[in-house]
Design a protein with these regions (language model features):
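Periplasmic-binding protein-like
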Residues: 1, 13-17, 57-62, 110-120, ...
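An alpha-beta-alpha
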Residues: 30-94, 113
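Active-site-proximal beta-strand/loop segments in catalytic clefts of secreted hydrolases
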Residues: 17-20, 35-37, 61-66, 91-95, ...
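Extracellular/periplasmic periplasmic-binding protein-like sensory domains
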Residues: 127-172
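Extracellular glycoside hydrolase catalytic/binding regions
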Residues: 10-47, 162-168
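Loop/turn elements at helix/coil->beta-strand transitions in domains of secreted/extracellular proteins
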Residues: 9-14, 27-30, 53-58, 82-88, ...
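Beta-alpha junction/loop-to-helix N-cap segments that form part of ligand/metal-binding clefts
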Residues: 1-26, 34, 92-100, 121-124, ...
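Structural motif
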Residues: 41-44, 91-106, 172
Length: 172
């Protein structure tokens, strides 16, 4: 997003391979992308939660002031509510390392699923702390969770983790 005005004012074409936020290329005839957008990603993950887990209640946790996570959270919330689901949303401040209160809030809200579009550093902490709290429902997120950091955090726990991804097993 920050570089878009530079590309536009200099008439330099740019192609983003993983910039899922619609604002990145908005109103810029020189900026293109090759990936899906967050409105699609949020909707897919909301439908996945409803279809795969019969989720009626979702708990959404994103970082305050972070464009990617806040935007993706909004798209998920809108889609999940359109599907008839109920959502409890919270945001955590940058630098948070103790997510136990948020996990407890998810449990208290009767969450059938957590959707947490955030950086992998926070994701790993959310996963391990959810496991410690005994949270036994799926934790889902967007494309940033496609990382070995997530696999390492989940390893040895019973926490189910799912994320959207650009991977296509049928693509040669």
């Amino acid at each position: 997003i920050a570089a878009a005005p530079t590309f536009q004012s200099a008439s330099i074409p740019a192609i983003g391979c993983s910039c899922t936020n619609p604002a990145v290329t908005e109103a810029n005839p020189y900026y293109f992308r090759v990936c899906f957008l967050d409105p699609f990603q949020g909707s897919v993950m909301a439908n996945f939660a409803k279809d795969e887990f019969s989720a009626a209640n979702a708990y959404v946790l994103s970082m305050l002031g972070e464009d990617y996570g806040s935007g993706l959270a909004t798209y998920f919330v809108n889609a999940f509510e359109d599907l008839g689901g109920t959502v409890t949303s919270e945001q955590f401040p940058e630098g948070t390392s103790d997510f136990s209160a948020y996990i407890q809030n998810a449990i208290n809200a009767g969450a059938d699923v957590i959707f947490a579009p955030c950086a992998t550093t926070y994701a790993a902490q959310i996963i391990t702390q959810a496991a410690s709290a005994g949270f036994d429902k799926p934790i889902t997120a967007g494309d940033t969770w496609e990382s070995s950091v997530i696999l390492d955090a989940q390893k040895g726990t019973s926490v189910q983790v799912y994320c959207s991804t650009f991977f296509d097993e049928n693509d040669d």
